[in-house]
Curated annotation (Swiss-Prot):
UniProt biased composition (Basic and acidic residues): 57-71
Gene name tied to this protein: sft-1
GO biological process annotation, one example: mitochondrial cytochrome c oxidase assembly
Annotated protein name in UniProt: SURF1-like protein
Localisation per UniProt entry: Mitochondrion inner membrane
Keyword Membrane annotated: yes
Length: 323
């Protein structure tokens, strides 16, 4: 039964606010009551004729329905699992596992480098009589002592080579033939055959670094030690030809890299080379201590690559298969 107009005149309409539900609103003189009414936003009104009384139990506005619908859609997003999504997921998983593996490899390589550096400070031992590769390979970067004499007439130079001795960034030692401004990397390593006293075998000794303007033997005759002597040195192995480096030309005395077998064959020595220790440096002579622990370590670049690939492929996978 519809309410008479007089009943609506007693209903309080509040402008520009959404009110709470009220249980009972009584009207005087009519005997009617309204239960569980909902009040919504209305425009200001002076009389019941101007009032925009919203009907009972009115549905939600379109704006509210759209907002609620958007929230429900967002909350319902999930992964669209299928055979294709599972197969594509193996790409970031595989890349992540390789990144973890390279992390362990990096730690192993850093520990190896520290171990090799520690060998340089160990107590020197006698060079074994067995000079085979199998015997000397475990001694790489180990300190040894040798006794014998240099064969200066057969010396040669590997160049270009940089300096690696501890005194590279310090001033030249007193009496050295190098001034502070000459302590650059533009030079080479002086290799001199060395005849062992006990066995008579001839090995190769890297006496140290020389600047290029001292390559001529006539400029350093007074720096060549004579007679029998004992010196500490570091065991080294042969090296492969670096990329973009030319081939050695033994007939012309041109050496770019340390090929022990080629050197031994040309000069009639054993395929053994030792780096003279830094303390063997003589005033005005080559600078010893040119041992550079050069262990290839690209694991940091590898793990960065794999983890980056993991992130990119995972974001692509989520974008494609999340619905």
């Amino acid at each position: 039964m519809p309410l008479p107009a007089a009943a609506f005149a007693r209903i309080l309409v509040v402008s520009r606010q959404r009110l709470f539900n009220t249980r009972i609103i009584h009207t005087s003189g009519s005997g009617y009551s309204i239960t569980q009414c909902r009040f919504y936003k209305t425009t200001p009104c002076l009389t019941h004729k101007q009032s925009q009384i919203l009907d009972l139990d009115a549905p939600k506005s379109r704006e509210n329905r759209e907002k609620d619908g958007g929230k429900s859609k967002k909350s319902k997003k999930s992964i669209k699992w299928s055979t294709g999504s599972v197969l594509m997921l193996t790409i970031p998983v595989f890349a992540f596992s390789l990144g973890i593996w390279q992390t362990f490899r990096l730690k192993w390589k850093l520990d190896l480098i520290e171990h090799l550096k520690g060998r340089l400070n160990q107590t020197a031992q006698e060079l074994p009589e067995d000079l085979s590769c199998e015997s000397l390979e475990p001694l790489e970067y180990c300190r040894v002592t040798v006794t014998g004499e240099f064969l200066h007439e057969k010396e040669f130079i590997i160049s270009p080579r940089g300096r690696f001795d501890p005194g590279k960034k310090t001033s030249a030692a007193a009496g050295s033939m190098l001034s502070e401004n000459e302590m650059s990397s533009h030079g080479g390593h002086l290799i001199t055959p060395f005849r062992l006293k006990n066995s008579g075998k001839i090995i190769l000794i890297n006496r140290g670094w020389l600047p290029s303007f001292y390559f001529d033997p006539e400029t350093r005759q007074k720096t060549n030690p004579r007679g029998t002597l004992t010196l500490p040195a570091i065991v080294r192995k042969t090296e492969k030809r670096p990329q973009f480096v030319g081939q050695n030309v033994p007939e012309q005395g041109v050496w770019y890299y340390r090929d022990l077998n080629q050197m031994a064959k040309h000069y009639g020595t054993e395929p053994v080379l030792l780096d003279a220790a830094y303390e063997t440096t003589v005033p005005g002579g080559p600078i010893g201590g040119q041992t550079n622990i050069n262990v290839r370590n690209e694991h940091l670049n590898y793990l960065t690559t794999w983890f980056t690939l993991t992130l990119v492929t995972m974001l692509m996978w989520i974008h494609k298969f999340r619905k």
